[in-house]
């Protein structure tokens, strides 16, 4: 359940600091959020797909850790990212 190349490029353009910025915390969180949203739609149709659900939980955990790191190191960027993504924090 990966994202298309176009979707990734759009996220990189919106949240990246440069053209090839794939490693910044904001980009990683935005990519994880897009994948999580995609999987949530998948589970509306495939309720009993427990293998993918485990992957979803890993993504949510990774996003939570990245957000905690960003909040601890740069609170202003954290708040901007939360607002852009529409996360409940």
UniProtKB/Swiss-Prot annotation:
One of its GO terms (cellular component) is cytosolic small ribosomal subunit. GO terms for molecular function: rRNA binding; structural constituent of ribosome. Pfam families: Ribosomal_S15 (PF00312). Keywords: Ribonucleoprotein, Ribosomal protein, RNA-binding, rRNA-binding. GO terms for biological process: translation. InterPro entries: Ribosomal_uS15 (IPR000589), Ribosomal_uS15_bac-type (IPR005290), uS15_NS1_RNA-bd_sf (IPR009068). Belongs to the universal ribosomal protein uS15 family. Part of the 30S ribosomal subunit. Forms a bridge to the 50S subunit in the 70S ribosome, contacting the 23S rRNA. One of the primary rRNA binding proteins, it binds directly to 16S rRNA where it helps nucleate assembly of the platform of the 30S subunit by binding and bridging several RNA helices of the 16S rRNA. Forms an intersubunit bridge (bridge B4) with the 23S rRNA of the 50S subunit in the ribosome. This is Small ribosomal subunit protein uS15. It comes from Shewanella oneidensis (strain ATCC 700550 / JCM 31522 / CIP 106686 / LMG 19005 / NCIMB 14063 / MR-1).
